[in-house]
Structure formats: structure tokens, C-alpha cells
Amino acid sequence: TGLYEAMLEAKDKGMIRHIGITNHRLNVAHEAIESGLYETLQFPFCYLATDKDLELVQDCKKAGMGFIAMKALSGGLINNSAAAYAYLAQFDNVLPIWGVQRESELDEFLSYIDNPPALTPALQAVIDHDREELQGEFCRGCGYCMPCPAGIEINNCARMSLMIRRAPSAAQLTDEMQAKMRKIEECLHCGRCK
């Protein structure tokens, strides 16, 4: 396509230092590792990771490839930043991207630089509870499935029951949000959101 060649040229000119790839599919991620073309892989990774996700992290390490953990808080479903930080700190080849939405959250993560949370039994209990409640196939809110041909806000609607349980529910129960949820009745069953 010429895109990779353009990145190589930019690297040769000193315009960029590294070439990485981002995706959400395990098979594509493994192909990227095996290709040897990329220096980093950006992939969803958090303490809700499956064994296959953990294997991907190890495969990157074996290949000398950096691993950038996106969705480290699972699009807001993980609400204990100390547990998330302590879990990811176990992996010396993983650099998380924290989805900071408020200044207070930024302050929280900045405080971990000087005082990093350790994976204590109490934090492990938080992780175990969240895994029991959340692990498996669920929407992380990335929005890659958008736009929906029926006008459904897939990334919000698919996560609604989880968000009501895990976040302040008032924002999810507005008339506007209820109207957006009713759009589900117009679903075309095209499978784009799978």
C-alpha cells in the first residue's frame, strides 16, 4: 500500500523513531509480531485479560517488541486505578495508556510515580471480584464498530448494564440516554457490532 514504506522513509529521515501497530484482533496481533516489521504493538490489555492476551504479551517480549496496553481501565469499567496499576506493573514489557478523563484521575496516576501501588491481597481481591463480574466478551467502548447503519450508539448501548452497575447511574438514566437505548429496537442485525 505504500504506507509502511512511508513510515520507513520517515524513520530514515529521523521524523519518527519507532514504527508500531495498533489493533484489537489477536490473529492480526500475532501476524504483526511474526512479521518483524513493527517495534511496538498497541492492544487492549488489563487485569481482565484472557490467557490468550497474556500469551500475546509474552510473545511480544520474546520478539523484543514493546507492548502498549490500551483500554487499561476497560473503557471505564475498571474503577480501581491502584489495582489496575499494580497488575500491569508486573509486566516489564507493558506500558499502559490510562484513559484519563478528569484532572483528579490524572493526579491519581501521577501520584503513583512516587508511590506505586503494590499488588497486595486487598488489591488482588478487587481484581478477582472484577474478573468474576466482567471477564469474557464485553464491549470496551473503543467505537471501532461505529457508525451503526441503524444509528445505534453501539459503544454506549452494549455497555449500559455494566455502566449502570459500575458507575454513577444518573448519567445513564437521562431521557436522552433512554431515547438512545430505544434505538436498539431498530437494529438491522447486520453483525457490525460483533
Please annotate each region the language model reported:
Residues 1-68, 73-76:
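Glycine/proline-rich, positively charged
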